[in-house]
């Protein structure tokens, strides 16, 4: 009797039919992947992407040249030169450079900044063709801040209860 059952299974190709049914279910199921360059997935508010220097709403840069980000950077990727003190006692940076080749995107600079001047924004598409383009100066960082300010402010506001 066992040989008849085995012959029936082989003749009716039960394993083949069940495997084919499984394949067809997966074929018509929704796709789990994205067509990346054309479709982009959601990014976490805590995502650490391209660096940016922020400005106050009046247009003045936030960085007060305290150099805490330079001191805490484990990769020593940040270089800051502070300008002379102003009449009101504040000072600003003359030079603010980040070597993105050295940067390990740890976020320590963002955590150390007392005025939220340096942040890691939501941009993850900043590949370049040359190394020189990965040396960010103050102008490039401020341009990034201007470009991504709305998203950066939203992400900081969402993360505020946990800071």
Curated annotation (Swiss-Prot):
Its EC number is 7.1.1.-. It is an enzyme of class 7 (translocase). It catalyses: a quinone + NADH + 5 H(+)(in) = a quinol + NAD(+) + 4 H(+)(out). The keyword Iron applies. InterPro entries: 4Fe4S_Fe-S-bd, 4Fe4S_Fe_S_CS, NADH_quinone_OxRdtase_chainI. GO terms for biological process: aerobic respiration. This is NADH-quinone oxidoreductase subunit I. The lineage of its organism: Bacteria, Pseudomonadati, Pseudomonadota, Alphaproteobacteria, Hyphomicrobiales.
């Amino acid at each position: 009797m066992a040989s008849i059952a085995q012959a029936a299974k082989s003749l009716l190709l039960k394993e083949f039919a069940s495997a084919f049914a499984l394949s067809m279910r997966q074929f018509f199921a929704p796709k789990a992947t994205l067509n990346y360059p054309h479709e982009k997935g959601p990014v976490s508010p805590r995502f650490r992407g391209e660096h940016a220097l922020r400005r106050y709403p009046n247009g003045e840069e936030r960085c007060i040249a305290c150099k805490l980000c330079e001191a805490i950077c484990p990769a020593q990727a940040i270089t800051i030169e502070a300008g002379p003190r102003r009449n009101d006692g504040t000072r600003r940076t003359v030079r603010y450079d980040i070597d993105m080749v050295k940067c390990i995107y740890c976020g320590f600079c963002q955590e150390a900044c007392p005025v939220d001047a340096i942040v890691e924004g939501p941009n993850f598409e900043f590949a370049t063709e040359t190394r020189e383009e990965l040396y960010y100066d103050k102008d490039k960082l401020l341009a990034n801040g201007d470009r991504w300010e709305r998203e950066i402010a939203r992400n900081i506001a969402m993360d505020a209860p946990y800071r």
